[in-house]
Design a protein with these regions (language model features):
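Phosphate/pyrophosphate-binding loops at sites that engage ATP/ADP/AMP, CoA/4′-phosphopantetheine
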Residues: 38-51, 154, 158-159, 265-269, ...
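Conserved catalytic cysteine-centered active-site region
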Residues: 25, 57-111, 142-149, 222-249, ...
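Condensing-enzyme catalytic core mediating Claisen C-C bond formation in acyl metabolism
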Residues: 1-27, 223-291, 295, 360-361, ...
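Conserved beta-ketoacyl condensing-enzyme motif
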Residues: 22-113, 118-136, 189-213, 287-288, ...
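Active-site pocket-shaping loop/turn-to-helix segments
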Residues: 13-39, 59-62, 85-99, 138-146, ...
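Active-site-proximal alpha-helical scaffold in enzymes
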Residues: 87-118, 155-185, 256-263, 328, ...
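Glycine-/small-residue-rich "gating" segment that lines the acyl/pantetheine channel
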Residues: 121-159, 163, 218-243, 395
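N-terminal extracellular/periplasmic Venus flytrap/periplasmic-binding protein-like
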Residues: 11-13, 24, 28-33, 44, ...
Length: 395
């Protein structure tokens, strides 16, 4: 079986949904912009070498429908002969697309694929016609729970305190602030000029303005534990513990990752960041979907005869602090190996792109820190965990 490598990964900055820099920007336009940037950054790879585009999207409807993977390919500098498709596994869609690309390369179908994902929650328009399967809703009601309600289930069922959630959320904000100060994200972010709808809070008047998204805009470095403790629960106002402060932020953005056979990378003279070593998913009860990594991580490690101690860096998506705290403690992941530069609580979480962002970031971390193995993992709506294994490419 052929070795598969991660050659490069780029993304937009992450903007706040509805009131941030991408509130008028389509996801296929974001993807086309960073695909072009990927081509520009890798001039030794001719555009015609890219055989397919695989893009993840958490809610591929409305502005995100009509196969944004193919649309992005057509909008970009890629030739018309490059295909494109869109995949959905909710919050793991971005890493799912990378896994699908890697699997097809391993099988000999392709040599070069650009994978990734996008989400614009600002423009998301869900089609609710016939949305609910009545038999499914009756037999497994948790599958239709809002994600925040599943977080409350985890908090109550497994006794994860409000204090532990807020402490984790505070640490995430501080780590992202430090990462931004040190430039830890700079190499992966591609600035994008766009138009933003700016609304005057006092008058309600709105106008379009020229705007450049050149960094992540969601971090709140002024966050305090006292401020987090003062926030009211959102999903269970009377007895809950999940707040806006200890949950991931709604945001807009896109990420693409260049996935290639090792032989093709050598042929083109490209220096990969990491090997793709494996990927797995596993289901859990839908009403506690946040603990999905507790299922998929052991399965992944067993598949490759590894233990938690063998992994040098972990990227565990911060959908909610409660599920990160639970999975961290249950799996035995040390905090000094986990989400070293913060995560979705402090950076933002455009559902379809986060997995690709995490893969790109952990690949760089492995190189910058001279570490060997990294795992990216996340919970998934509907009750699942998804996990991927990556290894630093030797210098």
């Amino acid at each position: 079986m052929r070795n598969v490598v991660i050659v490069d990964s780029v993304r937009t900055g992450l903007a706040k949904s509805h009131r941030g820099g991408f509130n008028m920007t389509r996801p296929d336009e974001m993807l086309a912009h960073i695909i072009d940037a990927m081509l520009d950054r890798n001039p030794d790879m001719p555009p015609e070498a890219v055989e397919d585009i695989i893009m993840g999207c958490g809610n591929p409807e409305g502005a995100q429908g009509h196969n944004i993977g193919r649309n992005a390919a057509v909008l970009s500098k890629l030739p018309m002969t490059t295909g494109g498709t869109t995949v959905n596994r909710y919050c793991s869609s971005g890493m799912q697309s990378i896994s699908m690309a890697a699997s097809q390369i391993m099988a000999g179908c392709y040599d070069t694929v650009i994978a990734g994902g996008a989400e614009t929650i600002s423009m998301m328009n869900m089609n609710m016609d016939n949305f609910v399967n009545e038999r499914l809703a009756e037999e497994v009601p948790g599958i239709y729970f809002p994600m925040g309600m599943t977080a409350e289930v985890v908090a109550k069922r497994y006794d994860v305190s409000r204090e532990a959630q807020d402490e984790y959320a505070f640490e995430s904000q501080m780590r992202t602030a430090a990462a931004q100060q040190s430039g830890a994200y700079d190499d992966e972010i591609i600035p994008m000029e766009t138009k933003m709808l700016l609304t005057n809070k006092e008058t309600g008047d709105s106008k379009e303005v020229e705007y450049t998204v050149d960094k992540d805009e969601c971090n709140r470095p002024e966050t305090t534990l006292e401020g987090l403790a003062s926030l009211k629960p959102v999903f269970d106002p009377e007895n809950g513990s999940v707040t806006a402060g200890n949950s991931s932020q709604l945001s807009d953005g896109a990420s693409v990752t260049l996935v290639m056979s090792e032989d093709k990378a050598k042929e083109l003279g490209l220096k990969p960041l990491a090997y793709f070593r494996g990927f797995t998913t596993m289901g859990c009860e839908p009403d506690e979907m946040g603990i999905g990594p507790d299922y998929s991580v052991p399965k992944l490690l067993k598949n490759y005869n590894m233990s938690v101690e063998d992994i040098d860096i972990w990227e565990l998506n911060e959908a909610f602090a409660v599920q990160v705290v639970y999975c961290r403690d249950k799996l035995g992941i040390p905090m000094d190996k986990l989400n070293l530069d913060g995560g979705s609580i402090s950076i933002g979480h455009p559902f379809g792109m986060t997995g690709s962002r995490q893969v790109g970031h952990i690949a760089r971390q492995l190189n910058n820190m001279d570490k060997q193995f990294g795992v990216v993992t996340m919970c998934v709506g509907g009750g699942m965990g998804a996990s991927g294994l990556f290894e630093r490419y030797p210098s």
